[in-house]
C-alpha cells in the first residue's frame, strides 16, 4: 500500500 511505501506501519 501507499503507507507501506513510506515505511509506515499502522
Swiss-Prot record:
The keyword Secreted applies. Expressed by the skin glands. Keywords: Secreted. One of its GO terms (cellular component) is extracellular region. It is found in: Secreted. This is Dynastin-2.
Amino acid at each position: 500500500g501507499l503507507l507501506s511505501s513510506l515505511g509506515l506501519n499502522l
